[in-house]
């Protein structure tokens, strides 16, 4: 059995199965949301510190929405070039969000288990008919990730 087995059990519900090999067995996970990775004010060094710790602890990574900020496109009335990273100022804005995020997260692809969209990604899907979460997950899968893309949900 691989370290993690993932499956969707019903809409909005997902199961991660692992095999315990001793009474003292434990598993670590990095649970994150609202990374807003592409925003100029995001602390990517801290983000990297957390990812490296997940790698060191052999932890799975679960991200539950708004990995992308995606608010700096010319169509968004809230857009501000001050909140835009230099790599997103060169045209192809939506493509650059996926490219930059994938490049940053690919070294951790093998432990990225779950990724779901937040309202930021949902807004892009609604207005521009491109799924940033699925596109980012596809890039991670190309590097061997078992990542499952969840759905937008709340309580």
Task: Locate each region found by the language model.
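Short glycine- and acidic-rich boundary segments immediately preceding or forming the N-terminal edge
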Residues: 1-18
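A short catalytic or substrate-binding loop motif that flags glycine-/basic-rich loops and adjacent residues
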Residues: 7-10, 146-150
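Core catalytic region of metal-dependent phosphoesterases/phosphodiesterases
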Residues: 16-32, 37-149
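Short, intrinsically disordered, charge-balanced linker/junction segments flanking boundaries
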Residues: 152-155
């Amino acid at each position: 059995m691989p370290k993690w087995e993932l499956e969707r059990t019903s809409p909005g519900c997902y199961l991660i199965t692992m095999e315990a090999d001793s009474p003292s067995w434990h598993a670590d996970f990095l649970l994150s949301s609202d990374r807003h990775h592409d925003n100029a004010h995001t602390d990517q060094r801290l983000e990297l510190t957390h990812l490296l710790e997940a790698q060191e602890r052999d932890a799975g990574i679960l991200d539950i929405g708004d990995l992308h900020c995606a608010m700096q496109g010319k169509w968004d009335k809230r857009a501000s070039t001050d909140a835009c990273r230099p790599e997103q100022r060169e045209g192809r804005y939506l493509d650059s969000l996926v490219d930059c995020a994938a490049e940053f997260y690919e070294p951790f692809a093998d432990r990225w288990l779950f990724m779901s969209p937040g309202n930021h990604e949902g807004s892009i899907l609604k207005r521009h008919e491109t799924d940033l979460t699925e596109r980012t997950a596809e890039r991670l899968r190309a590097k061997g990730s078992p990542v499952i893309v969840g759905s937008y949900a709340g309580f």
